[in-house]
């Protein structure tokens, strides 16, 4: 039997990936997405679709941050390339305080409205307030949600152990962000280690409230344009990882078959392999 472990690699054989996640569909997302797009970064924006404001509504001038969007502006913004739209529950409640039927309504109504708005399939989510319990997770699973982000910082680059408890690396104001960024840019996992995922989250209105747009601007400057980093949305991370897990290996791990529609990369020993959709290849070490 084989003794060497097999480790996933991201598209192109890369060992590092970066994803961002921002909540609440606020006007400050326009500036954030402009920064992301200019630097080639990708991310996921989590929307409570009940909270859109009516077309033509004007906020009072003293409202400086946290302004909600109209549906029309949200459709324009979150349809841009490199941006995923995901659920944040329909009315942004504390889901763990609700009955099973109320939780299901929040998820189904949010998913139904976003899928109608954007004309696609929406299966990702971030928990409103970051709170949940086992019953919330069960209902999410039954409603077809495949991942949901929490607010619990890991301060690590580990992939999630449970997709419906997807803990991020850190919030953008975490004091560890600079050292984590430096480590992620300058170092990399060894060939016999799991790949790294750097996951940063927040709310774009915080950049105005806290007067710290420089945090995300500096972060984008430092981490963008690296040919050894895969820049991806949350769903792209989930889909690729799940496709890797669908690879079929012979008992002695001398052959591998890829039943998915995506080319998958992995290492074994000191070798990097890629297996195309529908292909079976030998593993020589």
Please state what every model-predicted region is.
Residues 37-146, 153-170, 196-204:
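Metal-dependent polysaccharide deacetylase catalytic core of the NodB/CE4 family, i.e.
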Residues 22-25, 89, 204, 234:
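Active-site metal-binding loops of divalent metal-dependent hydrolases
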Residues 16-18, 193-200:
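Generic beta-sheet signal
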């Amino acid at each position: 039997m084989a003794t060497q472990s097999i480790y996933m690699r991201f598209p192109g054989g890369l060992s590092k990936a970066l994803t961002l996640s921002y909540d609440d569909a606020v006007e400050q997302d326009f500036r954030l997405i402009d920064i992301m797009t200019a630097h080639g970064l990708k991310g996921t924006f989590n929307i409570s679709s009940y909270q859109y404001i009516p077309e033509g509504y004007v906020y009072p001038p003293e409202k400086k941050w946290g302004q909600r969007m109209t549906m029309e502006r949200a459709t324009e913004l979150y349809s841009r390339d490199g941006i995923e739209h995901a659920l944040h529950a329909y009315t942004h409640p504390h889901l763990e305080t609700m009955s099973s039927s109320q939780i299901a309504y929040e998820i189904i109504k949010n998913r139904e409205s976003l899928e109608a708005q954007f004309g696609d399939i929406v299966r990702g989510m971030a928990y409103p307030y970051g709170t949940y319990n086992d019953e919330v997770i069960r209902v999410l699973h039954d409603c077809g949600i495949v991942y949901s982000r929490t607010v619990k910082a890991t301060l690590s680059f580990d992939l999630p152990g449970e997709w419906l408890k997807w803990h991020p690396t850190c919030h953008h104001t975490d004091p560890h962000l600079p050292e984590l960024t430096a480590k992620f840019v300058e170092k990399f996992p060894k060939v016999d280690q799991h790949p790294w995922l750097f996951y940063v989250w927040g709310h774009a209105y915080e950049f105005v409230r806290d007067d710290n747009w420089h945090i995300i601007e500096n972060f984008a400057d430092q981490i963008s344009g690296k040919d050894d980093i895969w820049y991806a949305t949350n769903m792209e991370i989930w889909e690729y990882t799940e496709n890797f897990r669908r690879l079929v290996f012979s008992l002695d791990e001398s052959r591998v078959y890829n039943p998915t529609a995506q080319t998958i990369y992995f290492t074994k020993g000191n070798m990097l392999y890629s297996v195309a959709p529908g292909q079976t290849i030998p593993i020589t070490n």
